[in-house]
Amino acid sequence: MEFREMMEQREQSQACLDSAESRQDSTFRQMRRKRQQLAEEASIAILEKATAGTLALLGDNDYPYAVPISYVYHERKLYFHSALAGHKVDAIRKCDKASFCVIEQDDVQPEKYTTFFRSVIAFGRIHIIEDEGGTHDVDNIVGGYHEKLEVARMLGNRYNPNHDEALQKEIENGLSRMLAIRFDIEHLTGKEAIELVRGRQNND
């Protein structure tokens, strides 16, 4: 499959996700304290800015398994990388439902017995990006391997930008020993402390 066709298919898939977004959101619990809810744009901005969060999965014996992990956000998707095997990988293969939490602010206010917080939680479906059947020639990439390579480049540029040569060498040496993971966001909520809401309103 040509790269252009792959991108067209991806755009069509994204359009389907967007059209179903309202239906998906209706299946999730709504925030009780609406006044503290962040706008969608503010929640996305937090995901774009942060460098790590906590990924929650259904682990062994159906116990919740929450693991801190670095990530990159792109077009309503989260991307992660992983070793080829482990608790996280087994959990993802067993159940594709997941959530992801990022805490942007957590300022303890001792005298008020509270914290000034701002955080985001995403709910969605998580998948291992399979690269079987593709070619691993970086000059002739097809199949799932292309998406895996794209994820590796996004992660590398996110944490060490403007070092293309070093990133290329790292990818060539380590790509075969890593898994790429995609989290398709179905529902996104952000919340902040009421004190932050009031402070912003007073400044307006």
Q: Whereabouts are the PLM-identified features?
A:
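Charged, gly/pro-rich active-site loop segments
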Residues: 2-34, 107-204
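A generic structural signal for nonpolar/aromatic side chains embedded in well-ordered alpha-helices
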Residues: 46-47, 91-92, 155, 183
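Short solvent-exposed loop/turn micro-motifs enriched in small/polar/acidic residues
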Residues: 48-50, 63-64, 112-113, 176
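Short beta-strand segments
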Residues: 50-84, 100-101
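Helix-adjacent hinge/juxtasegments
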Residues: 87-117
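Short, basic/aromatic recognition patches
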Residues: 26-54
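Anion-coordinating catalytic cores for phosphoryl-, nucleotidyl-, and glycosidic chemistry
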Residues: 3, 35-36, 44, 87-90, ...
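Broad gene-expression machinery/nucleic-acid interaction feature
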Residues: 52, 66-68, 97, 117, ...
